[in-house]
Structures are given as C-alpha cells and as structure tokens.
Amino acid sequence: MSSRRRAYPQPQYAATPAVPAADPQLQQFQPQQAQGQAQQAQGYGAGSPAYGVDQVNQQFQNMNVGGGVAGQPMANQYSGQYQPPPSQANPQAPYQAPGADSFGSQFAQHPQYAQPGMVGGAAALPLNQLYTTDLSRELPPSITDLSLPPPPIVLPANSVVVPTSEDSNAPPEYFRSTLNVLPANNSLLKKSKLPLALVVRPYNTLHIDSENIPVTSDTIISRCRRCRGYINPFVTLTEQGRRWRCNFCNLQNDIPSAFDYDELTGTAKNKFERVELNHSVVEFVAPKEYMARTPQPIVYTFIIDVSIDAVNSGLTSTITRTILESLDRIPNDNKTARVAFIGVDSNLHYFKFNEGLDGTDLLIVSDIDEPFLPSPDGLLINLNENRSTIEKLLIDFPTYFEGTANDRFALGPALRAGHKMISNIGGKLICFTATLPNIGEGKLTLRDEASHSGKPKESQMLLSNADKFYKSFAVECNSAQVTVDLFLTSAKYQDVASLANLPRFTAGQTHFYPAWSCAKAEDVTKLSREVSEHLSMDIALEAVLRVRGSTGIRMSSFYGNFFNRSSDLCSFPTFPRDQSYCIEMSIEETIHKSVVYFQAAVLHSTCFGERRIRVMNLAIPTSTKLDDIFASADQLAVANYFTHRSVEKAFSSSLPDARDYLVKSIVDILNVYKKELVAGNVSGSSPLQLSTNLRMLPLLLFSLTKHLALRQERVPSDHRAAALNLLSSLPIPHLIKYIYPTVYSLHNMGDECGLPEQIVQVDEETGEEETVNSTEILLPEPLNDTKASWENYGLYLIDNSTELFLWVSGDVVPGLVYDLFGTDNLYSVPTGKTELPEFSFEESEFNYKVRQIIGKIREQKDSVTWKNLYVVIGGSSNEPIEISQQRDLMALRMWALSCLVEDKTASEPGYREFLTSLKSKITQ
C-alpha cells in the first residue's frame, strides 16, 4: 500500500445541519426553588433569554458550597458542570488554627472539640441548587451527562478530624449513594419516589499493584465498642484528643496509645498523620483476632468438559493451552498456590501427580451417583513445586480424549468431587463446558422454548432454576469458602438460567460464549484472553462485607453475586475485583443530625496470605426539603438500583412486570416533581420536567426496557439469562454502556483522535511550557444512539460494553474503504467477527488511528472482558442483490442497530414516542 494521507471531500463529511450536536443543552434550565417560595418564572418561548453553560457555571460559583467527593481537588472533580466553591465552605480546604503550628497543638480550639458529637455550622450551609429541564425540549438528550461525576457532596467545613485531608470522603468509584442529600425522615423519602441505596465497589482494578490505597500495617485497629464501627476521618476527638466519639452511635472510645507513641522505636507519633484519619478508603493489616484460621493458599480446581462436543469444538485443547500459558499470571507471590484438574464426560477423570516423579496417573471414576476421590493425595498439588509436571500434563491433556464419542457431561458429580477435594481449604472451581449437563446429579433437559419465548410465562418456564441442586449446592460451596466460575461455550442450549445460580451465590461469574469454535481465531482470542485475565486477578479470599450506617438507617436489601449470610453480612468465598454491589436502605426513625455516615468494610485474606480489612467511609448531609433531595440525586447510581430491581422482578415475576416497573418508576418520579417542585404547578405546563442532574434517568430506564435482557421480542433464553446476569453484576461505568451503548463517528473525527493526547507541562525552574504526549489515546466525542445522528456515507464504531460494531455505511466513500481495509470494493470487505488489517501510520494514517481507538477501548484495567469486533456493512440502494439476500448479514445489521436504543423498532417505540406516551400518564 502506498504511503499517503488522504484528504476526503469535505462536503461529504460535514455534519448534517438538521441534527443537533450532542453537547450539554442547558438553555432550558432555570434555577428552581421549593414550591411556595417566591420565584420569578421564566417562559420557554422565543423571547426568553437562553440559560447557557456560563450562567449555570456562574450559579455554582456563587453558591457557598463545600465538600464534595474526595480524591482530587474540587476543581478537577466537577469540571464541566460543577464548579469549585469558595474555600470557606470547603471541608477539604487547608485549615490552621490561629497561632497553632501543628495539629497536635490546635485540637483544643477546633470546633469539633467545642461541641462534641455535633456538626457545627451545618444549618446555614447551602446545598446544591435545583435546576429544571424540560425533557420534551431536550431532544436529542444530552448524553455527555453520562460521563459527569455525581452532584457534589456538600459538608460543613469542620466535619473532618484533619481539615487538610483531600480525600476524607469516598470517591464515587468505590462508594456512592443514590442520593447525595438524604431525606431526614421516611415520609420525605417515600414522597420523593427516589430510591435510597448504596453502590459498593471495593476494588477498582484487577491487580493490587494498580491501586493506590493507603495501608496501615501496624495492626493497630481502633473500633467503637458499641457499634463496632472503625475510626475514620469523621469521628470527633474529645478530652484533649485522648478519646474519640463514634460518628455512628456517639459512644466515646479510647484512642490507642500507639496512635501517639511508637513502642518499637520509642518515638512520639502524630495521630493526625494516621492513614485512617486522613483517607476515606483504607486497608488495615489485621491481627490474629480477625482470623478464624490461618489465611489459606489460593486454590484453582479446573473442571474441563471432555465430551465429544467440547473436543470437537476445540474447547478442551484451547483451555488447556490457555491455562498453560497463564501459569505465570496466577497470583503466587508466596509460592503456595495449588491446582487440580478433573476431566468430565460420563466419567470423572482425575489426574494424580506423583511426588518426586515427572509423570501423572489418570484415575477414572465411573460411579457418578456417589462420586469419591480415588486417591488421598496427589490430586491437589502445589503449583510452584510441580510446575514441570503440570506443564507436561497440560500439553498432553487433549490427547487423552482424542476421538471420543462420549456425549455425556456429568457436571453435578464433578462439582461434588471438586468440592470434596478443596472444601477443607476453600478456593475456586472453574468450569469450562460445551455441553448441557445431561447425566447424574443436576441433570438438565431442553425446555420448550418455542412455546414460551416472548410469552407472559417466559420467566417461569425458561428463566427459572430447573433443578434445586444448583441453588442448594451453591450455598454449600459458600459455607466451605468455595467459589464457582463458569465458562459456557456451545452452539446448543446450555440452560444458563439454571447454571448461573452457581456463581450467583458463591461470588463468582458466568461467562457466556454462544456458538464458540476454535475454527474462528477471534473466538479463540476472546476466550483465551478472558480466561487468562480471570486467572491473573488478585482475588481476596474468605471475605465478608458489612455495611453500617448512622442511627435510624437500616440496610434492608442486598443485590449482587454473593450469599447473604445474615441480615447485614454478605459472604464471599473469593472476592472478585470486576463486580459491584447494591444495598438498599430504609429510614426507620427521623434523623436529627445534619450529616449521616456510612461505612463498608471487607474482611478478607489477600492472595499472598495476609488478613486485611478494606474500609470505605462516606458522609452525606441531610435535609427536610424535597428540592435538596432531587438536586443531589445521582442518576447513574439510581439507574443502577432500578436495574437490580428490574432483574429481580424478571426472575421472580415476569418480564412484562419488570418493564412496567421501570416505566412506573419514571412516571412516579415525574409526577412528584411536577406536583411538588415545578414552580406554582402551572396548569398546562409541560409534565415532563425533571431536575437537570436526573435528566438522563428516563433515557437509561427506557433503554433498559429495550435491552436484550428485558425486551419484549423473542430472545433465546440462554442469551437473555446471560444478559440478566451481567446487569446484576457489572460496575456502573460498564453497566451504563451496556444499557446505553457508546457510538463514535470515525469518518469525520478530529485530526487528534486516535493519537496520544497532548499535555502541556510547565517546567518548575524555568516556567517554560512544553507539550508532551501522554499514554492516553484520544477518543472522538460520542454520538446519540440514533440513526438520526448518522450520515449515509459514514463510518461508526459502537461499543455496547461486551462487543464492538464497526458500521460501514453502504454509500461510504471508496477512498475511506481503501484506507481502512486496503480494498476499493466495499463488498469484498470481510464482515462479521473479524479484525482490521494492520497498516503502519505511514501506509495509512486512518487505519492506524481507527485501530488505536479500538485498542484503547479494549484496554480495561477493571474487567476481564475482551470485546470482539464485528464489521457490518450497511444497506444501500446500490448494493448487489446477492448481498441483500445474505441472512447472516441481515441478522448482523439488526443486531448492531438494536444498539441504537433511541430509535423506534417494529415492536418497540423510540425515545421520542416514549416521552410522548409518558405525558398521558402524568397527573395533570
């Protein structure tokens, strides 16, 4: 290919004038006050002054707002929508008492000590101001809001022990609430129709070394004697700093002497430098009192399908090769990791390792009704000590089952055997299957999909657990500290709905690969990469999660993959690093304090044998005003909560009930807002008004009703069950993209897109500015999920969190096709699951940039998912007849276009029609 940089015809790449840009549209906002307060109403007519970004920013600058989510300075946290407040109300602002030289000498004058247990000055503190958006005038919706942080948390300036601490309140990536101002009583919460819940994500990366969480290793842990809360940045020091008052229950506790004096070195210490008093997210190295037993080694038992379907599809050989190549990635710093291997068809094939010898013995157990371990030792072995023998087994493993004709798969007995093998230690049972379990305990059969798919009883007949074994066995595993992970690969029915119970109650995950085949290089790449990443994850072991809140607040419901051992204790045999959890709360008594507190603690053993406690702290102000509640609602966290509730209804009731629940929730919220917060509740005013910080919520919940998991169209039950499972476990950034896919326009992207982002650095000595390239690839701005934002000659990339679609419009410019694919003939371009040809920057700048963008999107430090790329050629009046008759291409087009959730389909409305239908449901 010749070296060139093609200049594409500008008229063809100009933005369509009729399509508004997807920028924040704030011109319809007006500052809103509670109903009954004097306010000058502004109309929406042509004569009304536009209320733009500058005006909104000015309003935020004029507000005496403090606090916010910690982790970085306020100016960096809330760029775009929320501006930094004046420093006098900022709890993160540096504080120095008059005449004080250190924290140790200033505590006597600190307001916290003057009024123990009270939050001074909070009554006069203004909270986030309410702005109203007319949803019907906000079309297309401003999707840039989906990347904004939640509304800032406004706290009194003296609410923390160490005023100079910049991250005393938990970052939303770890710990966030649906409401960043809590109702002071339950009646106000019910009146708002907004959910009160916490979203907890203790780990944000797959590997410990990519985190920057402070660790206190002296094993000195100070906890409240009454409620057992951990000392944190929001406690109050009393009695000249010798005691601390719990911010949860108000009990006074002694401060450990080790906070002020190091017995080992004989030197004085400054308690105000303690990690737990300065940081919202900390990790304690736990003493022996926190251990029921010595931390156990990490254990992986691989249960591998060796039936005819698995062997013929290449699953058996691919998995053993992947495990072999991933042995160095298994967390094993302390050289204690153990592994075992079981092959499964109608028999159980154990592999015994002989100590001191190179070979292994294959031991076959045909009694699957009462499976037993054929040897007391040699089945579960140390990875480091037996490395060469393990490698040889993995190389030879597929040869043991070549030419098999056995079509049986005894998954239940294999799970029982694996459980017996590791139940005294705990660990993981990782199952790789290509066959429906069809023999022995847990045997499953085909369901009548044709009769029930898309019908009212679909949930009951196709999505329910078909055998109680999968729930009861999962509970047994949880008690024995055993997690089950599933990797399901088959072109046939596998009953994902039943099998997914195993990971759901053992803190595992179900990975689904429909129609997987080793004949497709892309299939092999995806499975291998995801398995390898999964094995490399620095999981925590023998973990429990407890979330506590201030007096008057109760944790009522828990959502996610774990087992709820008691009313407030969630059990995790192993704690994954790529999932999040939702906890619903109830207000049981009136809250009289101006700030409430939440604390999530994960007691766990690290994969390198250390017992630790990860503690996350969150402080949120309270209010008795409904407008404060709405102005500080976190729309992404609210959407996360409604997602969990809709999944629960899909399983327990029906899919129509789940969709109706989502629509009713939006209607209820709009009704409350119109009745209580629209100024004067003027008759004839638009019923579709909502606070600006919630304006994406109707779009997200509408998109959820059209999602593969909930849509009313016929969907294969395995696909639907797998989608429901993802909805209930994905962290918020991935969940939002899974509900509302991200679309990028590639044909008219800026010259800087696809290249490293340029950063201006200032030399501290000379003051000179220097432009350097960062490691971050710049992505194009996203478009709305609608064909109306597309051009019929464009090139678009769709990211739905699990796959990537490269849409090549049927009337695309031939030069662009050549630069991207190396051919002028559009219809010679390979479609479906594929990869782009690789050209250097000199050969084709456009190809290089697009591949860089795809590579950047695939980079995920917090997920094991590898996104396959599907190339889709769009329709055209000029396409050959044989192309338009290709069923696979037609299906691929429909799949990709289903990501454009704002558009109308044959059976479902578009977002504009949805908003119109809401008007009739809103009380006039």
UniProtKB/Swiss-Prot annotation:
Keywords: Cytoplasm, Cytoplasmic vesicle, Endoplasmic reticulum, ER-Golgi transport, Golgi apparatus, Membrane, Metal-binding, Protein transport, Transport, Zinc. Residues 224-249 are annotated as: Zinc finger-like. Residues 1-50, 67-107 are annotated as: Disordered. It is found in: Cytoplasm; Cytoplasmic vesicle, COPII-coated vesicle membrane; Endoplasmic reticulum membrane; Golgi apparatus membrane. The keyword RNA-binding does not apply. Residues 8-50, 89-98 have a biased composition (Low complexity). SUPFAM superfamilies: beta-sandwich domain of Sec23/24, C-terminal, gelsolin-like domain of Sec23/24, Helical domain of Sec23/24, vWA-like, Zn-finger domain of Sec23/24. InterPro entries: ADF-H/Gelsolin-like_dom_sf (IPR029006), Gelsolin-like_dom_sf (IPR036180), Sec23/24_helical_dom (IPR006900), Sec23/24_helical_dom_sf (IPR036175), Sec23/24_trunk_dom (IPR006896), Sec23_24_beta_S (IPR012990), SEC23_SEC24_subfamily (IPR050550), vWFA_dom_sf (IPR036465). It is a peripheral membrane protein. This is Protein transport protein SEC24. It comes from Debaryomyces hansenii (strain ATCC 36239 / CBS 767 / BCRC 21394 / JCM 1990 / NBRC 0083 / IGC 2968). The gene is SEC24.
